[in-house]
Amino acid sequence: GYTGCELQDDINSDPKALAMFETIRAHGAVKMGLIKHVDEAAKRQHTPKVAFVAAPKTYASSSGKVVEAAGIDLLVRAMSMGKLHHAMMGTAAVAIGTAAAVPGTLVNLAAGGSDREAVRFGHPSGTLRVGAQAVLENGQWAVKKAIMSRSARVLMEGWVRVPSDTF
């Protein structure tokens, strides 16, 4: 089994693990009605996503920084395009926040099982705080809002030369 502390190399260098996660993803796609047969999953790599969760544990992130169990509510690792993601995709983060807000889900239980509208989880690159408000209406769970913030890094800097007679 997995601990939830795995980093990219732990999963991505293991062909057996990758095949297992792909099998889970393919069968999930059929159950969700996204495809009719598991053989079609290879043509639909972007969805669904597969993630696994665990109760909080202290771990070292991919940068080597120690993430303390006391600072997170649970651990999450997510697959994207057939590999363990280096951090956490926005769509997966919102899904994790939503699942944490619904009592009795695996995510909610991994986070301690309490009523909550926010959760801080550890992922391979560090931590992320997300939230959701879910209510039970007529026997069905409904999500009233989902909350996520992201940090950004500079991807590129440069100059653009425009002739002065352009304006």
Sequence positions of predicted segments:
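Active-site proximal loop and beta-alpha junction motif in alpha/beta enzyme cores
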Residues: 1-167
